[in-house]
Every structure is written in C-alpha cells, then in structure tokens.
Regions:
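Cell-envelope/extracellular polymer assembly enzymes that use nucleotide-activated donors
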Residues: 6-8
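Short, acidic/glycine-rich phosphate-metal binding loop used to engage nucleotide
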Residues: 57-65
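Acidic helix N-cap motif at the loop->helix transition within catalytic regions
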Residues: 18-21, 42-51, 94-95
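A conserved acidic beta->alpha catalytic loop
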Residues: 26, 37-47, 60, 86
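Active-site nucleotide-sugar/metal-binding loop of Leloir-type enzymes
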Residues: 50, 69-81
C-alpha cells in the first residue's frame, strides 16, 4: 500500500493507556488520526502522541452531545470519510485492505458514489477467547461513513448520572445508504475483569433509563424508531422494547445466551461472559425499581404518608 489512505480516524479515550497503542498501531495507515481525550489521568496522551499530533480535549458538563457526536460536529476533518473506533478495538489487515479498496473506488470512479456508510462486524475477544456464540457474533456497527451524514442518536438518557461522557449503545443515524463490509473489527480490552464490571455498572445506569423509556413508550426525537417491519436496526429496537417489558430477564438472558445461542461452545470464557451479562440485566432491573421508588417517594401524597408514619 503506497502512502496514507484519505480517511480520518476518530478514537474517543479516557484512561486507555493499556489499549490505545494497539488501536493506533492498527490504523497507522490512515492519513489523519484524531484522539479525543477526556482529561486522562494515566499515560494515554503520551502514548497517543507517538502516533498523532491531533489530540482534542473534551470537557463534558452533562447532557447532549456526548463525545462522539461532539467530535463529529466540531473536529476540522481533512477527509470526507471517517472511521470511528473505541480504544479497545483494532483494525485487522483484511479490514484495512477492504477500506483501501472502497476509498480507491470512491476516489477514482463513480462506483460507490451511492454508498454513504458501511457496517463493520465486531469480533469480541474475551479472556483470550473469541466469543463466537452467545448471540454476540455477528455484531454489526456503523463505523465507516461520510462524517457530514452521520450522527449518534439521542435517546433522552443524557441526564442520567454516572454514565460516562461517550456514546456506548447508541446507534449512528445515517442520512444515506449503507452497506456491509466483509472483514471483522477486533474488540479486545486489555484491562481486567474489574474494569469490565466497573464499566458495565456505568452502562446499567444508562440502560435502566433507556429500558424505562422503551417500556413506557416515551417518544425520543432523533432516535431510531421501533418497527417490526423496518430496517434491521428498527427491528432490533422493536425487540428491545418488548424485552424491556419482560420479567425474569436475568434468567431468560442466561438461558438464551448460554443454551439457545450455544454459549457453552465458547468454553469457560463463554460461561463467565454469559454470567456477567445476565448479572448486568439484574443490575438494570434493580436500578429501574430504585428509580420507581424514588419517584413514589417524591409524590406529595407519599411525603404526607411518610410524615404520618413518623408522627404515629
């Protein structure tokens, strides 16, 4: 491959010293690499400077937008096409070559002019093993697209505390046509299980609000609609809305992942992964219940009842 590819890579980070080098090394072929940092306290920026001088600092004070949407809105991109990566992801040589071919076609010919984005399939490596089953593969994410045409959806959960400053499970809403790439994107966190659990504890705060919104029919502007007969993402959102109303989600999720989706074929790593993700459902359910209790306590009549119990 001669020269750099005409693409802008965006990597949002915070305290990713253990992951960022492998991620940046995997996109060294890109002409422009932006690292968007939330004031990391470790050596993340020192590592990043070995690969790029484009490091943007992100200050988050809550609300909308979070880091990825902020980057898409504000960074002075050199190129039309952007590739969004998390710090614990790596572009494989096959994916790099496929992106190279796409960009060459778009630049030299009219072929591909009608395509505005591409879905990439993430391949999760957990405890050193590819989680091929558990319902986790394939895992399609829109990551390569024309930056003016894509924004992450707004799910009315930005005001929830302790969820972090970056979009996680939101999807990109693309104003245009998208296709699917053949090669995988590796997803492997070099941090410990402690950090996995800590991260999913934050996610559960966000998920609890989203589940509540879906189950209660809260309308959100700028988000993907739920439709059984729509696009794959709209069908996925429809299923998630039904899922949010189900009882015993912890048990259902474990049975679905470990038995129905053959998670037991992924060995001990598969068992641990299914267990942790099922516990994640339990934590979400607990936080939804906690939110409901807090709402009940805040009602005027509830305060009167509480005062009467204290006085009696």
């Amino acid at each position: 491959m001669a020269g750099k590819l005409p693409i802008s890579v965006v990597i949002p980070v915070k305290n990713e010293e253990r992951n960022i080098a492998a991620c940046l090394e995997s996109v060294a072929w890109a002409d422009e690499i932006w690292v968007v940092d939330s004031h990391s306290a470790d050596g993340t920026r020192d590592v990043a400077r070995r690969y790029t001088d484009k490091i943007a600092m992100f200050d988050y004070s809550g609300g909308f937008p979070k880091k990825k949407n902020w980057a898409l809105r504000n960074l002075p991109f050199k190129h039309e096409w952007v590739l969004l990566l998390d710090a614990d992801e790596r572009v494989t040589p096959g994916l790099r070559d496929e992106i190279h071919e796409i960009l060459n076609q778009a630049e030299k010919t009219a072929q591909g002019a009608g395509v505005d984005g591409y879905y990439v399939n993430r391949k999760l490596i957990f405890l050193g093993r590819w989680i091929k089953h558990c319902g986790w593969y394939p895992s399609w994410n829109l990551r390569l697209f024309k930056h003016r045409l894509g924004r992450y959806e707004k799910l009315e959960a930005e005001d929830v505390e302790n969820t972090g400053d970056v979009e996680v499970h939101e999807h990109v809403v693309l104003e245009g046509r998208a296709e699917y790439l053949k090669n995988d994107l590796l997803h492997e966190d070099f941090k410990s299980i402690y950090h996995f659990v800590e991260r999913h504890n934050r996610y559960s705060n966000w998920d609890a609000r989203v589940y509540h919104n879906l189950a209660s029919g809260v309308k959100t502007s700028g988000s993907i609609r739920a439709s059984l007969f729509g696009s794959p993402l709209e069908r996925k959102r429809f299923i998630k809305r039904l899922w949010a109303r189900l009882p015993f989600r912890l048990l259902i999720r474990f049975f679905w992942m470990y038995f129905l989706r053959l998670g037991f074929l992924d060995g001990r790593a598969g068992l641990i992964f299914c267990t942790l993700m099922s516990m994640h459902e339990a934590v979400i359910a607990a936080k939804i219940y906690e939110q409901q209790l807090q709402k009940d306590v805040s009602r005027p009549e509830a305060k009167i009842e509480s005062a009467e119990r204290v006085s009696s």
